[in-house]
Design a protein with these regions (language model features):
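Conserved GNAT acetyl-CoA-binding A-motif
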Residues: 23-24, 48-64, 191-203, 221-223
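Conserved acetyl-CoA-binding loop-helix of GNAT-fold acetyltransferases
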Residues: 25-28, 34-48, 67, 72, ...
C-alpha cells in the first residue's frame, strides 16, 4: 500500500498459485496517477525478473501507458481479454430462434466432483494449478458440466453464481467450452433476469466468440491477458467474472 501521510493513495495485491504469481489488483488514486506510484507498487510486489520457477500473469484493462508499464516487469501479451455484453431480452429472443443448434446435455455437478474435474482440466489450459480457487467456488457457485460419454469425465465445465457471475469455464477442446457457457447464460437470463448479460472471453477462443457474436454480444471493454510465459489453452478457457483473476 502507498500512503500520502495517513491517506491511502494506491495499493497492489499479488496471489500465488503454484509456480505463478498473479497480480489481482493495482489501483492508484486519480490525483496521484502519473507520479510513479504504480511503478513503485509493482516493484514491491514483483521485485526482480520472473523465472522458470516463478512466473507472472495479470489481466490488464488499463490505458496504453499501463500496458507498457507491465511489460517492464516481465510480462507480455498472451491474448486479448474482452468484456462482452448483450441485452438479456435480445439474447433470449435470439436463443429462441436457434433451431439448428444441437448442443450436448449440460448437468449440475456436486461440489466435490466439480472441484476434482476442475483440478484435472484447468492445469492443462492455464499451465498451473489453482485448487484453492475451485474449493472456494465449490462453496459459493454452481458448476455446470457437459460429459464425455466415452470416458464418463467432464468435457466442459463452467462456474456460475446465484447473483449472475459467470466463469471461469474450461473445456477439453475449444468447442467443449461453448455448451456450458451458453447453459450458464441461459440460467442467469431466465432466473436472475438482469438487464444485461456479461462475460469475459479471450480473443483466441474462436469457437466461443463465434457463438456469442451470433447471439448479439458486443465488445464492451477490451483488455489483455499478460504473462511471463505462454499460456497453453486460452482458446478453451473462459476467464473469471469478476475479472480480478484469470
Amino acid at each position: 500500500m502507498c500512503l500520502d501521510g495517513d491517506r491511502p493513495v494506491g495499493y497492489a495485491r499479488v496471489v500465488r498459485f503454484g509456480n505463478i504469481e498473479e497480480l489481482t489488483e493495482l489501483m492508484v488514486d486519480p490525483e496521484h496517477q502519473g507520479r510513479g506510484v504504480g511503478r513503485a507498487l509493482l516493484g514491491r510486489v514483483w521485485p526482480g525478473d520472473p523465472s522458470p520457477d516463478l512466473g507472472r500473469v495479470v489481466v490488464a484493462t488499463g490505458a496504453p501507458a499501463d500496458l507498457s508499464l507491465y511489460t517492464n516487469f516481465g510480462v507480455m501479451p498472451a491474448a486479448g481479454h474482452w468484456h462482452l455484453r448483450q441485452r438479456t431480452d435480445d439474447y433470449l429472443e435470439r436463443r429462441s430462434k436457434e433451431i439448428d443448434a444441437a448442443e450436448p446435455a449440460v448437468h449440475v455437478l456436486e461440489a466435490d466432483r466439480a472441484v476434482a474435474e476442475w483440478q484435472r482440466l484447468e492445469p492443462e489450459a492455464l499451465g498451473h494449478e489453482r485448487p484453492a480457487v475451485h474449493e472456494f467456488f465449490g462453496r459459493e457457485r454452481t458448476c455446470l458440466a457437459c460429459m464425455d460419454e466415452s470416458t464418463g469425465r467432464a468435457a466442459g465445465l463452467c462456474w456460475v453464481s446465484t447473483d449472475g457471475e459467470i466463469g471461469p469455464a474450461v473445456g477439453q477442446e475449444p468447442k467443449d467450452v461453448v455448451p456450458v457457457v451458453l447453459a450458464a447464460l441461459d440460467r442467469v437470463a431466465m432466473t436472475q433476469e438482469p438487464p444485461q448479460l456479461g462475460v469475459f472471453a479471450s480473443t483466441i477462443a474462436w469457437w466461443l466468440l463465434r457463438r456469442l457474436r451470433g447471439l448479439g454480444f458486443r465488445v464492451h471493454w477490451p483488455g489483455w491477458v499478460m504473462s511471463s510465459e505462454p499460456i497453453p489453452g486460452l482458446d478453451r478457457y473462459l476467464p473469471t467474472r469478476p475479472p480480478n483473476l484469470l
